[in-house]
Amino acid sequence: MKKYAIYTVCEISEDMDFGCEERPADVQRMAVVTLTDPKGASLQVKQPDDILYEREIEEGDSVYFDLDGQLQKFHIIEEIENNLRGMADEKNAAFQRKLTPGIAPERFLGTRVPALRSYAKELAKQSADGCMVFLKTHPHPYYDEDLLHAILLGGIKEFDRCAAHVEAFLPYIDNWAVCDTLRPAVFKKNTERLLPKVQEWVASKKTYICRFGVGMLLSYYLDEAFAPEYLALPAAVSSEEYYVNMMIAWYYATALAKQWESTIPYLQENRLSVWVHNKTIQKARESCRITEEQKEYLKGLQRRR
């Protein structure tokens, strides 16, 4: 993959250095193109009208300068999709379709996750600007692109930039696999700054935003960043959605393994819905992270539906 400096076309206007009657016949018609770079800085360049027309460059396009110093459209999305098609595996696509029901079958290319992670590293290294173009593009037509998007977000090292991209991406997540792949490492290092967003996500009525918020509590707030009051956040969720309740049960089962004394009252005092309560006990008893005595005690806390 080639490395480019990527710009966004903000405005295209006529070059006013010559009036219509003053332009010599042998002088090419030019346009003034206003660009912004990935950091938001603005610059203006002159480009031949016919080049802009032939290359179908319009305001809002992502572009780069070719070897002749002329603007060229940056087709990162097409390039990524073509590369993913090259890694397609129909057997794996069939398997993924079974794991994620409700998603249109044609959205699955079947790219394997290890291959996606390797490709994400290559993409981030060779074309950082291209990554930014891709991350600003949603929704994606392919499930594989959503997974790649989540993996790329996980590698962003600046908290504010990562949080902004996550916020923009969350409304487009439509399955548990992409939701659970999205685990930005920078969030673990910034749990205090992240907490207000986690509280907002957990309270969301949208299935996968809520699931993501509970997943953040599970991943980043049961160890050093733990506080007993955080246990109340998932308990306050009232949902009939399987993928929300399943994540809540996983959260409390993990909390039992890591923070038993603070968590067990939620079962002793029936603070959870019956389904989440019993599923929590099931998952905890299947775990190797709690003792046999604890498992036996949990068995006695099961509730009838």
Positions of PLM-derived features:
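Short coil-to-beta-strand transition motifs
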Residues: 1-14
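Loop/turn positions that initiate beta-strands
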Residues: 58-64
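Alpha-helical scaffold domains
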Residues: 76-305
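Short aromatic-glycine-enriched beta-strand elements
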Residues: 16-34
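Beta-strand/loop nucleic-acid-binding surfaces
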Residues: 41-55
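Short, charged beta-turn/beta-strand-edge "cap" motif at the junction between a beta-strand
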Residues: 66-75
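A generic structural signal for short beta-strands and their flanking turns/coil linkers
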Residues: 3-5, 29-31, 41, 61
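Short acidic, glycine-rich loop/turn motifs
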Residues: 35-39
